[in-house]
Amino acid sequence: RENNFLVGISIDGPQEFHDEYRKNKMGQPSFYKVMKGINLLKKHGVEWNAMAVVNDYNADYPLDFYRFFRDELDCHYIQFTPIVERLSNRADGLRLSSLKQKDGELASFSITPEQWGNFLCTIFDEWVLNDVGNYYIQLFDSTLANWVGQQPGICSLAKYCGHAAVMEFNGDVYACDHFVFPEYKLGNIYQKTLVEMMYSKEQETFGAMKHNSLPQQCLNCSYEFACHGECPKNRFMLSKDGEPGLNYLCKGYYQFFDHVAPYMDFMKKEYLAERAPANVMEWARERRNK
C-alpha cells in the first residue's frame, strides 16, 4: 500500500464458476483461499484488480459474472481474458500447441466465438447504462482508446506487440507469456541482459508479426483499427479467402465492436470535446427508451 502497488487477483467469478477449473495441486477448489486473499487486501487498503478467465462454462452467465465483481466484491478494475487453447502431443512433451503447430485440437474448456461476443455485448449493455467512470473494464477502456486514436494499453489490441516478455523461474526469457515454447525463447538472464533480449532482432520481428501477418480479410475489415487482429496466439483459422492467420475469436469481436460502435462514437466526441466520456450513460438511457 505504501508504494501504491496494484495487485492482480485471478478469480473467475462466483464460487460455482471459479471452482469449475481453478483447482489447487491437490485437485481441491480454491475459491475460499482466493477470497481470503482479497479480504486481506481490502482490510489493509491495498488496491487490487480482478483477472478473470472467461471459459466455456462461465461465459453463458455474463450478468451473474459481472455483477459478482461489481456488487459482491466492489471490484472497480476488471480484466476479462477469453481462454482459447489447443492441445497436441509435442515431441518435447508439452501439451499446449504453439502458433506454428497446425495439428492442435481445441481444448474443451475454450470459449466459442459466439459465447465471447454475447458475453461482451451483454456486460457492455449493463455497464454503459450504469457504471462508466466508476467500474473499469479493461477491454472496454482499450476499445475506446483505439477509437480515439490512443494506445490501447494492452498488447492484444495494439497494432504491434513484443513488449510483454516473460521470465521463468530459471531465468529463461520468452517473447510473450502466451508463447512460452522453445521456438520463442530469447535467452537466459544469466547469459544476456533484458535489454539485449527485448531489443533483439528476434523480438522485433516477433512484435512486428502481429500486424505484418494479418490476412487480407482483417486489413479490409472496418474494425481492424479496434482489434488489430487481437492476440497472435489465437490466429489459427483460415480467412474466407483461405489465407492463414484469422483469429479464432474474430466473429465474437466483430459482434462486440459492431454492437458498441454508436456508444464509442459518442464517447469519442465527448473525449475530443474535453467532456467526460461517462456522459454516455445518460445518452444510452435515452437511446434505450426511444
Residue ranges and their predicted role:
Residues 158-161:
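Short, small/polar residue-rich loop motifs at catalytic or cofactor-binding pockets
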